[in-house]
Amino acid sequence: MEMHFASVWETISDHIPDEPALICDDDIKTWKEYDERAAKLAFFLDEKSISNDSKVGLYLHNSNEYLEAQFATFKVEGVPINVNYRYVEEELIYLLDNSDSEVVFFQSSYSERIKKIADKLPKIKAFIQVGGTDLLDLKNCYMYEEIISKNPSLKRKTRSEDNIYMLYTGGTTGMPKGVMYKQGAFMNSLLKTAFAMGFDVPESHLDISETVSELSAKNMLSKTIVACPLMHGTGMWLGALVHFFQGEVALLFLNLGLTQSFY
């Protein structure tokens, strides 16, 4: 039994490779593309010695790239760290330092903010810019799409269900705090929600893939609008993670605010 996010998604991508997994505006990625792009990012992370329990900050808006970067981090048994894009400099420094983040994926619109805090984050091995045409003039800064285009895919491997999944809370009780879960136990809790509508709770990632294949054969794979920010627990857990267990599509909006996205 291997209940691990990366292993589950890899198996789903093998069973329904040509089905869409991510849609953000006009950018559609199939499950095969989702897996392959994440594997190339994972190769880069592995080259930077990101491995079991290494932390990777996701300072991003809702986007395909957010979920690809998260998948890549899981592939190397790292821990994705959700970063609130509304944080100002001091909050960002605290969060990234407190979490021991070693890599940060950041939206290009926050380049200047990253530049201001970079020298106060000595643990960071790489800053990865998502979007924009000009790469931020900063040491150890890389363009997201160039990483994917220049690197091979990291080979798959067996992973531990004891790998950590972490969610940083907001600052309603002071500074942000990281809540840690073992992936196997956390996934089983999510699956009880995902399969509350008549499906048996699966015992392994292979059981999940069988359900996904059945839904695909019956043309019953659906789309889920991720309305909440992925950097919030609600947006990630109910907007993406639960639905991925059924091979569903995560429908994302890059623009902040639903009004801008729909009209």
What does each model-identified segment do?
Residues 151-168, 174-175, 214-223:
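Conserved pre-ATP/AMP-binding loop-to-beta segment of ANL
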Residues 189-226, 231-263:
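Conserved AMP-binding/adenylation subdomain of ANL enzymes
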Residues 1-21, 36:
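A short N-terminal helical cap/helix-turn-helix that marks the beginning
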Residues 47-48, 75-146:
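Structural core segment of the AMP-binding/adenylate-forming
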Residues 1-3, 135-163:
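Flexible, low-complexity linker/hinge segments
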Residues 30-32, 164-204:
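Conserved AMP-binding A3 loop
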Residues 61-81, 85-89, 97-103, 222-223, ...:
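A short helix-loop-beta submotif of the ANL/AMP-binding
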Residues 18-63, 70-71, 88-93:
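Conserved AMP-binding/adenylate-forming core of the ANL superfamily
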